[in-house]
Amino acid sequence: LDGRNAAADFETSDLLAMTIRGGCCSYPPCIANNPLCGGKR
């Protein structure tokens, strides 16, 4: 059960990261504030 939960959590966080990259990272102000976008710092 723990293994399945860990896999689900990983998939969820991965999907969330992709959503943030795809949506937030389309907007320069959001890119600047979000390290997931690879913002220049």
Swiss-Prot record:
Record's GO cellular component terms: extracellular region; host cell postsynaptic membrane
Annotated Pfam families: Toxin_8 (PF07365)
Disulfide bonds: 24-30, 25-37
Reported effect, residue 30 to S: In [C3S; C9S]Pu1.2; complete loss of HVA calcium currents inhibition in rat DRG neurons
One Gene Ontology MF term: ion channel regulator activity
UniProt keyword annotation of NAD present: no
Listed InterPro entries: Conotoxin_a-typ
Post-translation changes: Non-native isomers 'ribbon' (with disulfide connectivity C1-C4, C2-C3) and 'beads' (with disulfide connectivity C1-C2, C3-C4) also inhibit high voltage-activated (HVA) calcium channel currents in rat DRG neurons (25-30% inhibition at 1 uM toxin). Mutants Pu1.2(9-16), [C3S; C9S]Pu1.2 and [C4S]Pu1.2(1-9) are all C-terminally amidated.
Tissue spec: Expressed by the venom duct.
Propeptide: 1-21, 38-41
Cysteine amide modifications at: 37
Cell compartment(s), UniProt: Secreted
Keyword set, alphabetical order: Acetylcholine receptor inhibiting toxin, Amidation, Disulfide bond, G-protein coupled receptor impairing toxin, Ion channel impairing toxin, Neurotoxin, Postsynaptic neurotoxin, Secreted, Toxin
Secreted among keywords: yes
Entry remark concerning the domains of this protein: The cysteine framework is I (CC-C-C). Alpha4/6 pattern.
Similarity section: Belongs to the conotoxin A superfamily.
Function: Alpha-conotoxins act on postsynaptic membranes, they bind to the nicotinic acetylcholine receptors (nAChR) and thus inhibit them. This toxin also inhibits high voltage-activated (HVA) calcium channel currents in rat DRG neurons (27% inhibition at 1 uM toxin) probably by activating GABA(B) receptors (GABBR1 and/or GABBR2).
Note: Negative results: does not inhibit human alpha-7/CHRNA7 and alpha-9-alpha-10/CHRNA9-CHRNA10 acetylcholine receptors (when tested at 3 uM).
Protein known as: Alpha-conotoxin-like Pu1.2
Gene source species: Conus pulicarius
Lineage: Eukaryota, Metazoa, Spiralia, Lophotrochozoa, Mollusca
